[in-house]
């Protein structure tokens, strides 16, 4: 029940989706998870608990490569969970890293650590007997996975910008404060996983509400001109405005999001909308009330239209903004000027204004594993054993060894080189990204992570063929249209349709401020590569000075520019 007057005309009327029943009946996210944990007959969670464990930071999965074989043997799928940690701003200490490295090696099916586009890490392939010990291990080192999935505010991202150290520290602190402020207040996580004794009290969720949010909600803190967090993929963004190197406030961008459903034209990716400027004293209240307005007016009837972007388009940006202002008790000021110019990570060594050095390592697909001749995961662990600063996961699935003193640079660099963490990589490969997809993601329709290295090699060949091997396009591949790999902000984005088949979208830009448009529908690799060969060839000779590939394909009419997603994206 909202503490604010509700305007029924702004709500979607109709029978609530079953997820709303599930949340309302869950006893503040407890369900019967503890009962399922004791059930040794199945390796999975049953009924409502299958969805409820998401609010605790886990997705139930199975290895889809093994499904058919296990079905033939009359066995259930090889149920396990993927855990996503809550790491606002992606900062992790060396001793924490060594603990998660050991757990991944000893207690997961795949032995890997996966850095993700949510600026955190994931464990894949954790079996039921190891789930509770996993949470207890994380708690012991000061990490949890509360609200990294489910209809809540997810892990809060923050620009990975160690160069401007003071400004980055301020932005990071706001990311951490926002994360804490928007967390569920239920003690379910502590009771179920950490053995906290249940206290008989009347629990309430003052921000999220007792039925939580209509859909997932994503938040960022970003320092222009770097858009490494891809603001337009997120529901709520705080764009840092600085004067003389000091943070003075934020422009607030609301309503970004990339997920859609194939064949459903009521769904589409959308850029975030700039509501205006706020001072630092209002940050937490604004964050809270963007969330409460979405809580009260988001669509709880049709989950496909439940995200903030659809609420904005349905009730109008002005109505949404006005409602937030009324609840906060402050009007947004005029937006302050800023510009995004790029979103890639800065690889190699950079020196911060505080004299500390930072080494950004390229981790293809964010997958840290010991490969033949490239023991990447061991390499990071060896660095963590001697490193005196911290490690920072980026929203581009890479890793920064941050805060290195000048006298320690040589040792860190030697360890990185010895373990294949500083191999020569093309600019194209550094600007390509994929979601996890098969074999673990239950939503995957086509390969993504396992296909990307091969696809990039093909694209590198095309660039070289046309004499522009040092150039690149922002290339992203996702296994389904839910958007985890942010393909709908790429210059060339592949979205899985079925085994070996993708939609090809073109026309994003290097700064991540434009949605691409469908160019080829449901096609295989040969057709995709032929199209890219032709268009990259044209780009190499017809482009204007400094013109990126995405700008070029729009200028010459290959695809139309998506200005307003609701009307343009499917047109």
From Swiss-Prot:
InterPro entries assigned to the protein according to its UniProt record, in alphabetical order: CysI (IPR011786), NiRdtase/SiRdtase_haem-b_fer (IPR005117), Nit/Sulf_reduc_fer-like_dom_sf (IPR036136), NO2/SO3_Rdtase_4Fe4S_dom (IPR006067), NO2/SO3_Rdtase_4Fe4S_prot (IPR045169), NO2/SO3_Rdtase_4Fe4S_sf (IPR045854), NO2/SO3_Rdtase_FeS/sirohaem_BS (IPR006066)
Pathway where this protein functions: Sulfur metabolism; hydrogen sulfide biosynthesis; hydrogen sulfide from sulfite (NADPH route): step 1/1
Cofactor(s) in the UniProt record: siroheme; [4Fe-4S] cluster
E.C. no: 1.8.1.2
The reaction(s) this protein catalyses: hydrogen sulfide + 3 NADP(+) + 3 H2O = sulfite + 3 NADPH + 4 H(+)
PANTHER family, sorted: SULFITE REDUCTASE [NADPH] SUBUNIT BETA, SULFITE REDUCTASE [NADPH] SUBUNIT BETA-RELATED
Family: Belongs to the nitrite and sulfite reductase 4Fe-4S domain family.
Family matches, as HAMAP family: CysI (MF_01540)
Record's function text: Component of the sulfite reductase complex that catalyzes the 6-electron reduction of sulfite to sulfide. This is one of several activities required for the biosynthesis of L-cysteine from sulfate.
Name the UniProt record assigns to this protein: Sulfite reductase [NADPH] hemoprotein beta-component
Source species of the chain: Shewanella amazonensis (strain ATCC BAA-1098 / SB2B)
Upper classification of the organism: Bacteria, Pseudomonadati, Pseudomonadota, Gammaproteobacteria, Alteromonadales
Gene behind this protein: cysI
